[in-house]
Amino acid sequence: MQTQLKPLLLLTPLVLLSGCSTVSQIASIIAPDDDPTRPAREVAVADAVPKHEPLCKYGNMPSYKVLGKSYQPMRSAVGFSESGIASWYGPNFHGKPTSCMEEYDMYKMTAAHKTLPLPSYVEVTNVENNKKVVVRVNDRGPFHEGRIIDLSYSAAWKLD
């Protein structure tokens, strides 16, 4: 397992018609999976394009429990802000269902968050190099102490 730490990332969910709002978060990146070979196609992966979407049928339950800890997903991200660590997830989850019951693709611009409404759109800025990406939050996690968001492999790679 390879670990990469980055000093700071700024995460800002984008304001849309409903359910999303401005969110500020500070984070570092930790790589939980083996680092796959970086395919050339990743450079061309476009950021997620924010659009109004209904909440996912799955993943937005009033509460859920993982590893003995309870979480209450938000119905709206209005006024939300948080700081902490970001990690990325890749090959170990590639092709498996997300909390929205969509197939996880580590080469798309997606992310997982414990409580943001699914889906939400988040702008992530690496404040060390000012690189920014926009991701679509469609999964729950990370369920590791101190981590606030899991980025797809492509999202993390584009921020590096």
Regions found by a protein language model. Give the residues of each.
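Secreted/periplasmic proteins
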Residues: 20-160
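Bacterial N-terminal signal peptides that target proteins for export
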Residues: 1-9
